[in-house]
Amino acid sequence: MSRYRGPRLRIIRRLRNLPGLTNKLVESKKNQASGNDQSNQKKVSQYCIRLEAKQRLRFNYGLTERQLLNYVRIARCAKGSTGQILLQLLEMRLDNILFRLGVVPTIPSARQLINHRHILVNNRIVDIPSFHCKPKDIITIGAPKTYQSIITKRIEAFAKDQIPDHLTLSLSEQKKPKGFVNYLINRESIGLKINELLVVEYYSRKA
C-alpha cells in the first residue's frame, strides 16, 4: 500500500485530528453523529477500533502499510513494552523530529525539506526521512536563504513550550536554527493521542 496523497481533511474527519498530517482542526464524523438517535448507531467491533488506531498512527506519521508493519516487527524484537518502543521508533524519525522542533508545520513538509537535501545531521547531509535520530545528534538546516527566512519566522512564532523535553532548539547569531536530541523520547512526550496497545493487538497475527 502506497503513502496517502489525497485530501487530508477527509482523513481527519474520519480519524480525528492528526497533528503530523495537518494542523487544521475539524469536527470528526463521530462527534457530528453524537446528536443522532442512539438506536441508529451500530455497535463498533473491537477489530474496527484496532483498525482505526492503526490508521491514525499510519496517517499521522505518513507511513505506508509495509513501513508500519516493519516498525512493529522491530518493536517486538526489542526489550520492553512493544507499544512504547513502536511509538519511540516513529517519534525519533528525522522527519518527525523536524516537525516536533517546530521547524515545519507538518511531517509531509519536513519530508520535502529532507528529500531536497536541505537537512544535515552531525554536519552530514541526510536525505532519508526515516533516518533514526539518536541522543546527542545535532540537526541543522542548509536550505537557501529565502527558505531559511521562512523557517526562522516560523520558529520565532512557535511557542517554545510546545517543544518536547527530549529536544532543544536554538538560533545562531545568523538566525540559523539548530536542533539537538537530548535523549530518547518518553511516553509522556508523544505528540499523538493514541492507545498504542490497540495497534499492537491489530498486528498480533501479522507481525
UniProtKB/Swiss-Prot annotation:
GO molecular function: rRNA binding; structural constituent of ribosome
InterPro entries: Ribosomal_uS4 (IPR022801), Ribosomal_uS4_bac-type (IPR005709), Ribosomal_uS4_CS (IPR018079), Ribosomal_uS4_N (IPR001912), S4_RNA-bd (IPR002942), S4_RNA-bd_sf (IPR036986)
Chloroplast is among the record's keywords: yes
GO BP annotations listed: ribosomal small subunit biogenesis; translation
Compartment list: Plastid, Chloroplast
One CC-aspect GO term: small ribosomal subunit
UniProt entry keywords in alphabetical sequence: Chloroplast, Plastid, Ribonucleoprotein, Ribosomal protein, RNA-binding, rRNA-binding
Ranges where the S4 RNA-binding domain occurs: 92-156
Classification via SUPFAM superfamilies: Alpha-L RNA-binding motif
Pfam families: Ribosomal_S4, S4
Complex formation: Part of the 30S ribosomal subunit. Contacts protein S5. The interaction surface between S4 and S5 is involved in control of translational fidelity.
PANTHER family, alphabetized: 30S 40S RIBOSOMAL PROTEIN (PTHR11831), SMALL RIBOSOMAL SUBUNIT PROTEIN US4M (PTHR11831:SF4)
Protein family: Belongs to the universal ribosomal protein uS4 family.
Task performed by this protein: One of the primary rRNA binding proteins, it binds directly to 16S rRNA where it nucleates assembly of the body of the 30S subunit.
Name the UniProt record assigns to this protein: Small ribosomal subunit protein uS4c
Record organism: Equisetum fluviatile
Taxonomic classification: Eukaryota, Viridiplantae, Streptophyta, Embryophyta, Tracheophyta
